[in-house]
A protein has these predicted regions:
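Feature recognizes metal-dependent phosphohydrolase scaffolds
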Residues: 14-184
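Bacterial Sec-dependent N-terminal signal peptides
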Residues: 1-21
Length: 184
């Protein structure tokens, strides 16, 4: 009877007014900084971002221009760093059997969109410098999930991870990202 009671309660609850509360999307006139987002299709690159001037910026390129760098801003419109966009040829996921040993491993988790804390932790651990550049040599950075949720700066974290992956690899280091329950 308990389950039947729950079912009946849930059934009658469905009749409630589910009209969304909050502003109508058509009425929103101020957007926060967002992006850049890259889309690559049929040999064309499309870059979308909402700029600090509250404008939607869409740029298209034929292919991937050599030396392309994009500005990465925080949610409150502070320029954080530039990220070079690298062409990825024949992407292969590293095998779990890879047992490369590193002199040092630095692990961090549960970033929850807090770029400021992520950067402070990496700087304190001497993984990056004040310019958000890899200084951890041929060592290993492990990011153990939960990049998303709560904080407003998820995208800058993702761009920094992308940037650090290439910088680490260039000097024999490695960045490993493991999905957490917020990414699944």
């Amino acid at each position: 009877y308990f389950l039947l009671g729950l079912f009946i309660t849930a059934f009658y609850s469905c009749g409630e007014d589910l009209t969304p509360v909050g502003p109508d999307i058509a009425e929103i006139t101020h957007f926060r900084n967002d992006g850049p987002y890259l889309f690559y299709e049929n040999g064309r690159l499309k870059i979308l971002e909402v700029t600090k001037d509250n404008a939607l910026n869409i740029r298209e390129e034929s292919g991937l221009p050599a030396g392309l760098k994009l500005d990465v801003y925080s949610d409150d419109n502070q320029l954080l760093f530039q990220v070079p966009i690298n062409k990825i040829e024949n992407f292969e996921r590293p095998a779990w059997e890879d047992r490369t040993e590193y002199a040092k491993t630095f692990a961090v988790s549960d970033l929850h969109g807090r770029f400021d804390l992520f950067a402070a932790i990496l700087k304190t651990g001497e993984v990056i410098n004040d310019k958000y550049e890899w200084i951890y040599g041929s060592n290993h950075l492990v990011i153990d999930g939960d990049i998303f949720d709560r904080g407003a700066d998820v995208l800058p974290i993702l761009w920094l991870i992308y940037k650090l992956e290439f910088e680490a690899k260039a000097v024999g280091g490695r960045v490993t990202t493991i999905l957490g329950d917020h990414e699944e």
